[in-house]
Amino acid sequence: PEEMRAYRYGSYLNGGNGGPYGDEFAPAAAWLRLADEMWDASTAPLPNGEPAIPAIWGTDAVHGHTNVVGATIFPHNIGLGATRDADLVRRIGAATAAEIAATGIDWNFSPTVAVAQDDRWGRTYESYSEDPLLVAELGAALVEGLQGKAS
């Protein structure tokens, strides 16, 4: 929070094996406490009267909110693609969104909508399929689960 007050950066990302206050095994409550502290630091009044712009926190919850101890870990996209079940993927998105919200994080770098075309690619597991139509269907289902239905 001290660096946020000093530099007012607009966004930040937590990486793998990182946790609030240097504790990679921190519970969800510690993540939420840090989110609140960062929000307060980013919205604190500036000395020259300029408007304070809230920072946004991003996480890489591509198969559940896996940085948080106790969160649900779901199969990677390659396994979900094998099910060809958009409703399942939608429900996974909703469960992931609820767990992210409980930690105060605003932004998820998901879904991965890569279309794997070469099995030698090191991130093939992040693709639902080689079929672009299935990737589009399951990617849309995950977004709907994460964000809810448009009204």
Describe each model-derived feature in a short phrase:
Residues 1-151:
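Glycoside hydrolase catalytic-domain context in secreted enzymes
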